[in-house]
Amino acid sequence: MSTDNKQSLPAITLAAIGVVYGDIGTSPLYTLRECLSGQFGFGVERDAVFGFLSLIFWLLIFVVSIKYLTFVMRADNAGEGGILTLMSLAGRNTSARTTSMLVIMGLIGGSFFYGEVVITPAISVMSAIEGLEIVAPQLDTWIVPLSIVVLTLLFMIQKHGTGMVGKLFAPIMLTWFLILAVLGLRSIIANPEVLHALNPVWAVRFFLEYKTVSFIALGAVVLSITGVEALYADMGHFGKFPIRLAWFTVVLPSLVLNYFGQGALLLKHPEAIKNPFFLLAPDWALIPLLILAALATVIASQAVISGVFSLTRQAVRLGYLSPMRIIHTSEMESGQIYIPFVNWLLYFAVVVVIVSFEHSSNLAAAYGIAVTGTMVLTSILSTTVARKNWHWNKYLVALILVAFLCVDIPLFSANLDKLLSGGWLPLSLGLIMFTIMTTWKSERFRLLRRMHEHGNSLEAMIASLEKSPPVRVPGTAVYMSRVLNVIPFALLHNLKHNKVLHERVILLTLRTEDAPYVHNVRRVQIEQLSPTFWRVVASYGWRETPNVEEVFHRCGLEGLSCRMMETSFFMSHESLIVGKRPWYLRLRGKLYLLLQRNALRAPDQFEIPPNRVIELGTQVEI
């Protein structure tokens, strides 16, 4: 989305408020409550309130404003961001060994996101619905059922796209942030003493006074910056400047005012700790605020769901996940997609989490490990980009990395205390996703290498066929080829069993480049290998969906005319068996077989009419 047009800047900035800041914008619902709820051994004490507020404020400044908005967002791939993009950028100018390490870091970060995404909708919506306890305490038993109902409706509408509903996101979230600011300012005016907490000395005094307990309490403070990765991940949708402008003009002031307003309330009324956010509002505003909070948390959940769809598509296109059905819900916006399998798997996981944890305070114990783990990895990857890609001074880069890690590592370490009380959940989910992604990538590479090693030379085969041609039949045959310069298995088996060849043979390779988009000028490369053989290589970015009909159109413009309904597509269907291996590699091989059996078939991936496809089987040992 371009920001060159100054007239569109306010609209883009407003849209960024509606999508990018949903998660971090709903953190005031539960953050300060969890910090001062008594779980760390101290109650609502003046020094504790000032200490937590100071920590929250300076985390928002250092982590969000300086680290992500100023530094990390400099690293973009054709305007796109996200942990996998950062991984790709970091590995461009490094040795093979270093690249492997960076890839592992990027995959761990992506896996952490999958672990986090299960918790975000649950804790956000439950925190909003828990406002019922203030309005009508007798309805507290309805919190879990109502949360499930709200999220069920949200997941059900995903298949229809969020284009129409999405237009309401921005004004609702802008209203939300303005209400945050007004409620906080109202309380601060009544007790301006709370503004002393802006001084970082209070954060230092907090550590000195409470010692070990203060370190553990960082696990609650980090709730104030959950969703920070969305700022970088959504950079491609809105651009750097609108995201930064939205933060510094609307989001940051509103969050600070609300957190400090809650602190001012607690200094006067410590009993308000049961839900300081909703108790900021006058009685007459509780129900409207409850409704607005529910809408804001739904929007925050929607942003996370859309984020997991985008990450999944990127992982599929880069070869880290098996192909799956991806539906475009908008003809205008390529980023609006729906992945049915991911949608309903995520829904099931979220419902299980809500039923199991029952209250947002219990879920808060599970939140944070994945977020802070990703923060550590982002620091390492982004500074690698600064050194290798931007060629910054190595001492400056080292200084920046140390500064980032001095914040990230204590936050991550403090969250490890949550491991047994719920932190195991995102880590377990992340481990599962990491295992799946590394298994698919490594076993796929092993399979392609084996096909290359046991394949016949393409040039020699074509020369032999032209010299001693088999029976030719009219028409065009397209053979999907994964490996260049090697004869596709489907071509070999067609000659072996049918002993015929079409008049024109096209060897088609579809590949994904290390970029979000590929310009149409570079989309197709055509090479005539002989009078009757052509090789076509079609390149796509990881944000694009390969389409054979489009490839044919491009071929026609280059002089190679093809008609979809007059062409036969030959594909090989590998029947895989696991060979002799150590037991742990056999397990990985069996997991790959399971993933491969459930992967989307090639004709469906590339939108080829089923009645034009001929699949020839072959057995391959991995």
Swiss-Prot record:
Cystine bridges: none
Molecular function GO terms recorded: potassium ion transmembrane transporter activity; symporter activity
Location of the protein in the cell: Cell inner membrane
Parts of the chain that traverse the membrane: 9-29, 49-69, 103-123, 137-157, 165-185, 213-233, 247-267, 276-296, 337-357, 363-383, 396-416, 419-439
GO CC, any one term: plasma membrane
Catalytic activity: K(+)(in) + H(+)(in) = K(+)(out) + H(+)(out)
Topology with respect to the bilayer: Multi-pass membrane protein
Keyword line: Cell inner membrane, Cell membrane, Ion transport, Membrane, Potassium, Potassium transport, Symport, Transmembrane, Transmembrane helix, Transport
Sequence similarity: Belongs to the HAK/KUP transporter (TC 2.A.72) family.
PANTHER family reported for this sequence: LOW AFFINITY POTASSIUM TRANSPORT SYSTEM PROTEIN KUP, OSMOTIC STRESS POTASSIUM TRANSPORTER
Function per UniProt: Responsible for the low-affinity transport of potassium into the cell. Likely operates as a K(+):H(+) symporter.
Entry-linked NCBIfam families: kup, PRK10745.1
Name of the protein: Low affinity potassium transport system protein Kup
Species for this entry: Salmonella arizonae (strain ATCC BAA-731 / CDC346-86 / RSK2980)
Gene name of this polypeptide: kup
